[in-house]
């Protein structure tokens, strides 16, 4: 069974057909590159996979579980969108780092927000925060950015910002990691 199964995804914006009957399978550990000209729908496909856009047709499954089926309204519940998004990590083309937060804070923020939704958060807030920071520091080290944890995005190069965005996406331990324009700011190291 494929880790990711996309079947018949279509997306229209008014009379513009951006995605037409897109299907793909991705096995665990496999990498897939989607190459196309500007405006060909690559970003729209990623946005549909992450439920930032709603596909008009088709089915999205992760590890055999149906996350979206255009023909099944039960998969359209807004209350389930956040849970569905946790299957995917997305590194945006422009990284979308929060300018008012340090590299470390950018990585821990999503984990903090998720933790706050749990009933045990108030009693264990300090321990949870410490655990999230430790994980973020480990990811920064893996990205070669340990010395940049207290730097703000404007103090980082484009490649460094991208690596912080990758660390942020990895922090939530997604099943699938998606990159929009992954080579746009890589340092030539």
Language model regions located:
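Helix-to-loop junction immediately C-terminal to a conserved catalytic motif
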Residues: 50
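Catalytic Walker B motif of ABC-type/P-loop ATPase nucleotide-binding domains
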Residues: 177-180
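ABC ATPase NBD coupling module
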Residues: 67-89, 127-130
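Helix N-cap at the start of a conserved alpha-helix in ABC-type nucleotide-binding domains
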Residues: 188-189
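A short, proline-enriched helix->beta-strand linker immediately N-terminal to the Walker B motif
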Residues: 171-175
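Conserved ABC ATPase signature
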Residues: 152-156, 160
């Amino acid at each position: 069974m494929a880790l990711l199964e996309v079947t018949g995804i279509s997306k229209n914006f008014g009379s513009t057909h951006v995605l037409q009957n897109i299907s793909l399978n991705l096995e665990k550990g496999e990498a897939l590159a989607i190459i196309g000209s500007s405006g060909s729908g690559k970003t729209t496909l990623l946005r549909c996979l992450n439920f930032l856009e709603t596909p008009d047709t088709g089915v999205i499954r992760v590890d055999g579980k149906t996350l979206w089926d255009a023909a099944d309204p039960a998969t359209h519940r807004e209350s389930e969108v956040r849970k569905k998004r946790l299957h995917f990590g997305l590194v945006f083309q422009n990284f979308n780092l929060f300018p008012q937060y340090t590299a470390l804070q950018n990585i821990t923020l999503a984990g903090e927000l998720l933790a706050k939704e749990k009933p045990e958060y108030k009693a264990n807030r300090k321990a949870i925060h410490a655990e999230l920071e430790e994980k973020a520091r480990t990811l920064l080290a893996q990205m070669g950015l340990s010395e940049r944890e207290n730097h703000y995005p404007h103090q980082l190069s484009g490649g460094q910002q991208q690596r912080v965005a990758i660390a942020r996406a990895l922090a939530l331990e997604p099943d699938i990691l998606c990159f929009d324009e992954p080579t746009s700011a890589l340092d030539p190291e």
